[in-house]
Amino acid sequence: MTNLEKILVLGATGNIGFTVIQTLTAAGYQVRAGVSNPEKSRALWQDNDLVDVAHFNFLDTSTYPAALEGISKVFFVRPPQLSTPKEDMFPFLRFLKERQIAHVVFVSLIGVEKNPVTPHHKIEKEMMRLALPFTFLRPSFFMQNLNTTHQEDIQKHDDLFIPAGNARTSFIDTRDIGEIAAICLMNTPQHIGQKYSITGKEALTYYEVAEKMTAILGRKITYSKPSLLRFRATIIRRGTPKAFANVMTMLYFITQMGNAKQITPTAQELLHREATSFDQYVKDYREDFG
């Protein structure tokens, strides 16, 4: 049975957004996928009658009306390249307020309440100031960062080039986050105003991550433990924009301070199953690591 509500999913082609759409449409919900390149993305859902595709760009307010037409609820993540929320994201939040959207699910960051310099903190604060009907998902570091952001170093050098020191990280699988977001959107009343800190079931050092990857992939993976400054300089030299490099470096500094090691039962409570294990993630994404 098709649900008459229509939900806008932004970042629809990303790790989280794609799972949000899969979960919602499996339950009969109509979804609009907001994407930067509709022509390229349309093929992803050509066999799914519950998905329509619309052009959307946070920086282009002219894309807002058509994307939001007939929409009751919204899911969004902050595109990593947008690091100045006041200019990049606030116009969109104000538009949601004008449209009286019934529920807005935002993927934030664990520990964000203690880190006012992060873009996520500023977005949360503005959403609360506008009195948007929010749910904040505050995940720990994504397992999928390893097969995206850090993929090249693993493929080419068998190395985790990540400035996390000896700190532990309670990694979460983005597929779990996407499923949780969909659960919240399908059960709006009980999730409005909630701020969920979402983690996996274990907190690992990157030495332990390297050991697990070595065992599963069948080749030696090392953890070189670069300094924050060396990491930042290296990724900028490789072409990462400075603003994005600064945010990444700041997040790993937060990790070094011990703020990524927290383990919560929230994922299991919302999913009604255990969170995906790190070992399972590596097995599922084995081909991405070369």
PLM region spans:
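Conserved Rossmann-fold cofactor-binding substructure of NAD(P)-dependent oxidoreductases
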Residues: 54-71
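Substrate-binding strand-loop-helix patch
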Residues: 168-175, 199-215, 229-230, 276
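N-terminal Rossmann NAD(P)H-binding glycine-rich loop of SDR-like oxidoreductase domains
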Residues: 4-29
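Substrate-positioning beta->alpha
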Residues: 163-184, 194
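Terminal hydrophobic/aromatic helix or amphipathic segment near a protein terminus
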Residues: 196, 212-257
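Glycine-/Pro-rich loop/turn segments that contact NAD(P) or position catalytic residues
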Residues: 79-159
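Amphipathic terminal alpha-helices
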Residues: 266, 271-290
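Glycine/proline-rich active-site loop of Rossmann-fold NAD(P)-dependent oxidoreductases
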Residues: 146-152, 184-195, 261, 290
